[in-house]
Amino acid sequence: MKIVYVVGTCDTKGSELRYLRDLIRDAGCDVVLVDVSVSEFHSEASDVDVQPAEVARCHPNPLKAEELKDRGKAVAAMSQALVEYIRSRPDVDGIIGAGGSGGTALIAPAMRALPIGVPKVLVSTVASGNVAPYVGPTDISMMYSVTDVSGLNRISRVVLANAAHSIAGMVLKQVGAAADERPAIGLTMFGVTTPCVQAVTRALEANFDCLVFHATGTGGQSFEKLADSGLLVGGIDVSTTEVCDYLVGGVFPCTPDRFGAFARTKLPYVGSCGALDMVNFGAMETVPSQFRSRRLHVHNPQVTLMRTNPEECSRIGEWIGERLNLCEGPVRFLIPELGVSAIDAPGQPFHDPEADAVLFAALERTLRCTDKRQLARVPLHINDPQFADLLVTNLKEAFREH
């Protein structure tokens, strides 16, 4: 029988967690109730399968008793212990948790530690806001609790029941990855580089399972997480735009570890300058005041783009070059001299040959070329079909060197 782990703090959410447990059990799953309470006054309940002390013993560095009296430190410590506990369990067919901001922060890292495809549901009071810090590059399903997770009432019973039946359905009707003997290639795409990525995908799909990631910060993280996990045989990183948001302050930033997976794995890597002409913000009224006088373009009512200027382009090119210098596997980086996005072309709002020239020069002077690490300028626009052909050709060359 499939096993679902129900995780939360039984000292404050006991009735809700037991309600989840009972509904999931009634749906046909076995349940393991894991208590991660951190209150020093909490007493163990006999109907809990895994007590807090058992989870805490999984922490790699046992903390002193006085440290656990600080709630912030205790939550962080229990969260780390829970990660190690869940990793040690071979029978997690699915996991569900419920909590407020503290419980969400405690439980989410353990969910992120599980492989993609293992069902994960988190009922949370903070699920209607920015959930990126909790979900990260994984497939956690977050459900807004509507009312606080504080007792059972006419609202919480319905929300929790929906969550319980959701996780049960995911586990009992789980569909494994479709049988596909093709190796997987990761690609990064933004709306303004879509023609390029679609052309590359068409050229590769007969021989490769093409996994396309939207370059929205977490998209790049997912791309690299799969590379680190051994699920990709290489990458075509067309859209490195997340670097702009990271360095300038946009809403779709990469992490400082961008390109790190390819440095660690030495997988074949082909990259380009896709959408390095822009920084992303929300609706126009959310653009920070210091950028209001810059060249802005309304992409849609919820997304405003800002053109990167020469100074920013210099920093962006240098940062990418330095990160790629850490890669010792086959690296090809192609510069499309006639424009890096659909709106970086003659007559388009972000056409700026001067800024592009600064970007390209920064890449050239920073990237240290070797037999395996190469950079090339190409007199084409990034969305020109010939540029897509060159990306495919370079990937094939990188594979021959791998």
Curated annotation (Swiss-Prot):
One Pfam family, short name: UPF0261_C
Keywords: Plasmid
Keyword match Glycoprotein: no
InterPro entries (UniProt xref): Tobamovirus_resist_UPF0261, UPF0261, UPF0261_C, UPF0261_N
Cell membrane found in the keyword field: no
Similarity field: Belongs to the UPF0261 family.
Protein name: UPF0261 protein mll9388
Species annotation: Mesorhizobium japonicum (strain LMG 29417 / CECT 9101 / MAFF 303099) (Mesorhizobium loti (strain MAFF 303099))
